[in-house]
């Protein structure tokens, strides 16, 4: 059709969202299906890569079928208690978020497909809900009706090819009929669907709050029961900071707590500034890795030449009697092995100097640094005003952590439950509380600046991959893209989502590093802070900025900032296609690729070119670390998108449901069979998830209130306001009443469960045995272990 003055007769198939969606879906499906096929094949070929945790003794992981597809059903049928035992409490909470998302999106998708989409089709002529939020002219109300469109097309004026003349139709045709529409603040003619939008805003919001609070209760009960059965050192230990100088000694601090009569103390560890010890340990670790590398080369050379290797008595350990002899006696080896020993140059990065035996060189270095560490243990290190106190009772630790003990310093004594000993960032215990306070705010400011600065490349990409911009900057390329429907569809769907997927994949590592610089006491805290930073980055750059910058009108917007609200309200529904394409690519295309572990597989072949085969294989067989700071923000952001578009464009709910189903299966397999989660946050991650979901619900409600206001339906906007208040109050209630149960363990559960014998579950490997609260430089428990693994040949 030629007539498009009101945008209602445009039949260009290249501008059909469903056509673009089909292209994106089939591209993502091809990518995901190929990844699934390769995984099913590689899983049988390289079991040590795709299920490395099955080789660890004592885990007792459930066995999956060896067939190509039956393993998927076995994975689905693994019960929650087994998942909790195998993946840990944090892994269980992570998967529960996906289960909650599946439950919510199933309900919302049902509403969207059965009710909202037909409503959009009837009132707007578009089932996908690509509506304009701003208030159109009355003539646009008229022409937006499907019945009026049909009558105009059949009219002789249009049939004869004449231009449409409003005057010919008569001004009376545009007078709205009806009493309610004449009342200021109520929907205008053609906007009756807004009443249903308000109703479904209530339905979706209330159901989201229901699944959030029901999941919170489930997690709280499981967490209380799970932790109450434990009797580990971690569960009986508190971390205290802000100690004055007179309490920075073991005797005085113990006497102080004995005077308070809060409970019997089992052990006490004063934190000191062990910076010098950390330097020595870092050097020792470097020498051990070098020695392991060259020993592997030596074993490989011996195998090639058919020479027997040295006996296991040449393992190096600082406590062995051999170290009492001189380095020359220790490093003496039979002459026939000299030709197998690798040689290195020690001057100027290994470029100049005489070649010497690498094993002898680094063995001497290791011996020397071990002696330095032994001597450094007798040094007197300054205290840092912090300490770990382990009580004999878990209940005592829980009470002390929730009690205001004293105000000995300006900020008072601060007591909290201690992280696991193997999760502590010891170098952050060297700095005082004021230093941590200012350092934390400085990193927060840096994060804020990075998020804002990142809007420049994100906004530029959003503009330059727009067809209007391409036509203006490169007319020939723009015409070529217009003439090729498939290329046009790729530009509108696959290319933008692929580019932004790369941004989404890179940013988590930056924000995890920033969190590590914040001075936090444990890696678990760093993970939680990384989740918040990355989520804020995704919200600002991939929601707000893309909605604004995804139009060539951004330059006009910069000149007239007063039109920001009107422009944002108009742009939001028009970006629904991009977000649907993003969810399709991430869920159907990218999630299956995670199972293949292309990064680990490619790094293995690259490492084999530079390091011995044994070292590459050892890295290849080691389970990767599962980081919630990297994997959690994106699903929370996808849930935010689904919430905001749940009523405007309900089709997004269907693909959001697919995203969460595939993500649940992928992460369930990874947490049980592929990855370790060494952090120990004991399920406190749920508080972060809960508040971000409330934030998404508030954004959705504000969007719907803006829709009503910009359509001049002010009364309907005020109807949504009580729901907004109820949602905010729910978040406040969570923070004041429920959040404590996500941080502490109730005395009732402790008394009930610890009166019985500890179950085997609490003795499992997944209970995250923490060791003792001693700096690694003073921990003698690992001294008898060989420094290098000579069995890797």
UniProtKB/Swiss-Prot annotation:
InterPro entries: Csc1-like, CSC1/OSCA1-like_7TM, CSC1/OSCA1-like_cyt, Csc1/OSCA1-like_N, RBD_domain_sf. One of its GO terms (molecular function) is calcium-activated cation channel activity. The keyword Transmembrane applies. Residues 1-21, 117-192, 466-493, 556-577, 668-687, 735-793 are lumenal. It is a multi-pass membrane protein. It is found in: Vacuole membrane. The chain crosses the membrane at residues 22-42, 96-116, 193-213, 445-465, 494-514, 535-555, 578-598, 647-667, 688-708, 714-734. Keywords: Calcium, Ion channel, Ion transport, Membrane, Transmembrane, Transmembrane helix, Transport, Vacuole. Coiled coil: none annotated. Residues 759-778 are annotated as: Disordered. GO terms for cellular component: fungal-type vacuole membrane; plasma membrane. It holds the Pfam family RSN1_TM. Residues 43-95, 214-444, 515-534, 599-646, 709-713 are cytoplasmic. Acts as an osmosensitive calcium-permeable cation channel. Belongs to the CSC1 (TC 1.A.17) family. This is Calcium permeable stress-gated cation channel 1. It comes from Schizosaccharomyces pombe (strain 972 / ATCC 24843).
